[in-house]
A protein has these predicted regions:
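Short, surface-exposed secondary-structure junctions/capping segments
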Residues: 64-68, 222-227
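Compact, glycine/acidic-enriched structural inserts
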Residues: 201, 205-226
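Short acidic-glycine loop/turn motifs at beta-strand connectors
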Residues: 191-194
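Basic/aromatic-rich interaction segments and small domains that mediate binding to polyanionic partners
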Residues: 3-62
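Glycine-centered tight beta-turn/hairpin loop motif at sheet-sheet or coil-to-beta transitions
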Residues: 48, 185, 204-206
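Catalytic Cys-His active-site segments of thiol-dependent hydrolases/isopeptidases
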Residues: 42, 198-203
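Local beta-strand/beta-hairpin segments that build beta-sheet-rich folds
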Residues: 51, 180, 208-212
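A surface-exposed partner-binding patch
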Residues: 66-187
Length: 227
């Protein structure tokens, strides 16, 4: 896809000399077409101050996707699109105390999911647009979707209860993290320790395939290979 000035892009590799890591968001400020295609890309810190402005080639960049872009792709591909979560239900899920009869481990999972929704509005905003979704082998877990009156298999509470409260095996690499989705060969998690969204190998979950500061950066990494 041809890129233009002011397009937001995602860095697809580490640039140690620039102090930039894979997944960092930048803005194209100039396009070069000769002798080969290249882009002058501005990267800023959280305060909007420029921290680097390298010239990059197309292979070093990925397209930038948002939840609305994903929803459009799902509609175009005839994938089912769940309704957004009702604002009142969302407020309850974010602030209501877990049932007192729950065991401590279950309460901790519930509270971690609440903490994620509160502390990362970039992620929580997805549920104002659609309640999770499945697209070409990728699943983002839902909050309230149900099947025959029971939470769907992709319910984020169900998936995390299964991951962290399991009599057979509890993956030590996922303790203290919230699993927010999966692909065929990977799990998608949020790490409170690093305050980052991660794509981890499903079999060897100690291996972090990619790590992203922003949820939309994570989306861009997940969607571009399959879009």
């Amino acid at each position: 896809m041809k890129r233009a000035e002011l397009d937001v892009v995602v860095l697809s590799e580490d640039l140690p000399n620039e102090g930039l890591v894979k997944g960092t968001l930048g803005t194209i400020v100039m396009v070069f077409n000769s002798p080969t295609t290249g882009y002058l890309v501005e990267f800023c810190d959280e305060k909007g101050k420029t921290i680097a402005m390298p010239v990059l080639f197309p292979a070093q960049l990925k397209r930038y996707f948002t939840i609305r872009n994903l929803k459009s792709l799902m509609v175009e591909g005839n994938y089912p699109v769940a309704d957004p979560v009702d604002p009142d239900v969302m407020a309850d899920l974010m602030h209501k105390v877990a049932p007192v009869e729950w065991e401590d481990k279950k309460r901790r999972v519930y509270e971690d999911i609440q903490r994620l929704l509160i502390s990362r509005p970039d992620y929580a905003d997805m549920f104002n647009i659609m309640d999770g979704g499945e697209y070409n082998g990728m699943t983002l877990y839902s909050l309230v979707q149900a099947e025959n009156g029971e939470p769907a298999w992709s319910n984020i509470f169900v998936r995390n209860f299964d991951t962290r409260i399991n009599e057979i095996y509890v993956d030590p690499n996922l303790i203290g993290k919230v699993v927010i989705g999966e692909e065929s060969m990977s799990v998608i998690v949020y790490s409170f320790t690093d305050d980052r969204f991660e794509i981890r190998d499903k079999v060897s979950s100690d291996y972090v395939i990619e790590s992203h500061t922003h949820f939309n950066g994570l989306l861009s990494a997940l969607i571009e290979p399959v879009s």
